[in-house]
Swiss-Prot record:
Oligomer status and interactors: Homooctamer; tetramer of dimers.
Source organism: Microcystis aeruginosa (strain NIES-843 / IAM M-2473)
Known role: Catalyzes the complicated ring closure reaction between the two acyclic compounds 1-deoxy-D-xylulose-5-phosphate (DXP) and 3-amino-2-oxopropyl phosphate (1-amino-acetone-3-phosphate or AAP) to form pyridoxine 5'-phosphate (PNP) and inorganic phosphate.
Family membership noted in the UniProt record: Belongs to the PNP synthase family.
Family matches, as InterPro entries: Aldolase_TIM, PyrdxlP_synth_PdxJ, Pyridoxine-5'_phos_synth
Full protein name: Pyridoxine 5'-phosphate synthase
EC number: 2.6.99.2
The reaction(s) this protein catalyses: 3-amino-2-oxopropyl phosphate + 1-deoxy-D-xylulose 5-phosphate = pyridoxine 5'-phosphate + phosphate + 2 H2O + H(+)
Top EC class of this enzyme: transferase
Pfam families associated with the record: PdxJ
Gene3D superfamilies with a match to the protein in the record: Aldolase class I
Length: 240
């Protein structure tokens, strides 16, 4: 059954805007789980612009579903993951100047190093997922690192303005799902998904989990986090 990982980064974004202690992402995770979240996702960025080390450490103790730690494949972040031991990590690219993650990681440019990263993390029983574009060469490289998962980048699909473009990008995602599954990879997806566009991605073959954040937190400002999560679960089933 398709599951929902709720990304709570933007609860921390609001907190960090005033450098205060509220709202607390840890409390948000509890509410998200009450609302039906199947997992909690946080991105500990190198610049600590939203989620802080403290958040991840407490979430590791309090999350009752599973904790997905998004992070860059750097020595600092690997050390943190090995210490905290999230349920799994999703390795993502980072640029200091970006507002949000702009695309999938390039598996080909640092393939040998990425293989070593996967080996270190999975030797500590931390499954690894790569956040990548739905490109066959990238998917094959991700599989060759020994990772258990990939997360397909849905940003281009989410941002497409024309229906014909959306359908073409959806086809690319579908083919990526099928190819990844044929290689033994488990498939997640995320980035830019909203209540209005999620259903088509939820219907893709062999999809396991969707990681969604901004649209849920935006909705939560108006209706509360529990309801916002429940509504996303409905949207994923085409019932909203």
């Amino acid at each position: 059954m398709l599951t929902l990982g709720v990304n709570i980064d933007h609860v921390a974004t609001i907190r960090q805007a005033r450098r205060t202690v509220e709202p607390d992402p840890v409390a948000a995770a509890v509410l998200a789980e009450i609302g039906g979240a199947d997992g909690i996702t946080v991105h500990l960025r190198e610049d600590r612009r939203h989620i802080q080390d403290r958040d991840v450490r407490i979430l590791r103790q309090t999350v009752r579903t599973h904790l997905n730690l998004e992070m860059a494949p750097t020595e600092e972040m690997i050390a943190i993951a090995l210490d905290i031991k999230p349920d799994y990590v999703t390795l993502v690219p980072e640029k200091r100047q970006e507002v949000t993650t702009e695309g999938g990681i390039d598996m080909l440019g640092n393939f040998d190093r990425f293989c070593r990263v996967v080996e270190r993390l999975q030797a500590a029983n931390i499954p690894v997922s790569w956040f990548i574009d739905a490109d066959f060469a990238q998917i094959q490289a991700a599989a060759n690192t020994g990772a258990k998962f990939i997360e397909l980048h849905t940003g281009q699909y989410a941002e497409a303005q024309q229906e014909s473009d959306r359908q073409a990008l959806l086809t690319i995602l579908k083919e990526g799902c099928e190819y990844a599954s044929s290689l033994g990879l488990r498939v997640n997806a995320g980035h830019g998904l909203t209540y209005g566009n999620v259903y088509a991605v939820a219907c893709l073959p062999n999809m396991e989990e969707l990681n969604i954040g901004h649209t849920i937190i935006s909705r939560a400002v108006l209706v509360g986090l529990e309801r916002a999560v429940r509504e996303m679960k409905l949207a994923m089933r085409g019932q909203l």
